[in-house]
Amino acid sequence: LSFAASLYTDAEQSGLVAIAAAPGGVVRYVFPLEHRPMLVGYDLHAEADPGLRADIVNAIESRHLVLSGPYPLGFADNVLIAHQALFSPVQSPDGVGYWGTVSVIIDLEGLLTQAGITEELRDLDLAVRNQHQRVVFGSAGIFAHDPVTASVTVSETSWELAAIPI
């Protein structure tokens, strides 16, 4: 818990909302717990949104960090959830046993603001969309106006940033 506390304190300014550990896919540990006790007992494999479940399966099968979202949650307008599956040789004879998943919940607006991507930029209209073409920041119309674009890949998730002059 002290590791989670120091990580949370250092990253809170950049939009970190919570850290959750789910042994066997069921959330057992959440930091900070006092603001998100409803997450304890949540079964990522049974209760989660189908897209979220698919991303968790992808994290397990690929053994890479997988970014989900954005999702509207009760405690933030839109969040991204980064999932990392953990494996333990103790869990299975072949040494590849799935222990569970650690997820980090990130406030999307806070992350974009920390990165300097805000709608208040004076000379540009900005938008960001994920690999499923869902716009997560800005207006979808920006992509229809011949924008300058850049692709950003975070682990196995791609994002497209677009900008047009105002």
Which residue ranges define each predicted feature?
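Intrinsically disordered, low-complexity polar/acidic regions
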Residues: L1-E160
